[in-house]
Amino acid sequence: MYLRKSKKPNGRTYLTIVQGYRDAGGKNRARTVKSLGYVDALEAEFDDPVAHFEEECRRMTEEAARAQAPVTVEFSAARRIGKRSEGRVELGAAVPSAYLHRDLGIWSFFERKRTARGFSYDPCRILELLVWDRIAHPSSKFAAWEARGRFPRKCGFTADDVYRCLTYLDENAGALVSSMNASLEESRGPRDASCLYYDVTNYYFECDEEDGFRMRGVSKEHRPSPIVQMGLFLDSDGLPLGYELFPGNRNDMTTLLPAMSKAGVRDLPWGERVVVVADKGLNTSANIAACVLDGNGYIFSQSVRKATRGLKSWVLDDAGYEESASGSFKIKSRISEKAVYVAGEDGKRRRVTVPVKEVAFWSRDYFERSRRERAKVVEKSRAAVARGDLSSAAAKTPVRYAKDVPVVRGTGEAASHNWVVDEERIAADEAMGGYYCIVTSEQEMDDRDVIDAYRGLWRIEESFRVMKGDLGARPVCCSTESHIRAHFLVCYIALLAMRLMQLDTGRKYSAAQISEALAGVTGHLMDRNLYLFDYRTDLTDELAGAVGIDLSRQVLTRGQIRSIMADVKKPRS
């Protein structure tokens, strides 16, 4: 290291600390390590800035030399492993910790809370540990606490502290999510919330009893266990914006408005509006009316099978469609009216009509997929009818093309159960194969833009898969409602951190790849002060580079590990 003194055109001298090195071709190069400022400005702080920083350069050179010096470690062949000693450190945790502190501002949030409430534990540290556990190796809260020795920060809290913290996190969940959103906008600029994607899923519990929150409902996994519903919002870039939890027996269609209120997108400042994009299960009169009255927009899919006779006829009519050159896609639209019911000041519901744009399209890919799926169901239905072992309880989705008729065809004799294949329903479904319909308030939006916006729902479906799979959100190992709610807050924060990591690595890697890479950055204790690391990939380099740290070193001291963890708490440079 040496001090470079650069004379500027304004006559002032600028100081920088520079490091010399040789490039791959053997040529001498120099890189700027630190920009210091003008000498005359530094004289207000140092008597002799040049002498001071020349001494600093010598100190940094000596430190760099010591860091590159060979390390010798001796092991005894008789040495035994301590049963209670932890010989590993998961330094990959530094990457998500950087996002928690720099982008989501969790330390600042809890510091503000600290002045109003005394803590016997550090809620920020506990949350950091639980989020890392979700990302690297999802487990119970107690198991995460037991593995705290591998976390690269001191975790001097008890298991009871963790459970007390869960209650505290639940009490402050709404404020924390709002604070994270504000911090994210401060660090990365305004978020694109012009389109908000919304969907609902549920999570099962390995218990038998309902308790008012964990309730039996329509399980996505077709399990009889009690479930909890989660509604999730994503912004236009696919980043989580907010969520809400509901009892398991809550109908999906009734969750949108409470979730919008929780996310703060119902009472927006004058002139601001969002367009809510959701599937057909959310396409209800109440949701459409609320969006219109709030000054917001909507893009909802519409079931062709359950549509009115007029809408179904229009969708299936070839007239008006614009077909692609390949013949694999066709589209048309029209301005129409939709009846909705609005509660008046007297509390009575009144029927009103609102103008809507209906976009119909047909896709060969969708057609082929629906044909394959329908063929499987038809085959099961025919086989079930041939066996004659159907009951009314069995005539559901797997055999939905079997119907019970009151008389035997041909003889006219009465029969308690006479199952036949419903050929008319098969033909009707074949006619609708590949057709989709979308209803929207955005009359000026291009038809293809409407479809593209609707297709963006795959991001939220994939987010649910990540939460349930890679982040291990189910089955939930908590039992009280406050702890269950805190568990999903941790999962939500882990998902948001994961999405930011994917964004900063060009969306090239899956959540599973990132989790595996970070979990692999584990150091093994060689002696009291040295850790040996043996895992490095292009992905770990990209993740570390995104937050400005170096995870490529094979040997690190405890002090160097502490320094890395301190660096990720500092603001982004």
Predicted regions and their residues:
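Anion-binding and metal-coordination hotspots
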Residues: Y2-L15, G25-N28, I106-S573
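Conserved glycine(s) in the ABC-transporter nucleotide-binding domain "signature"
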Residues: M1-R125
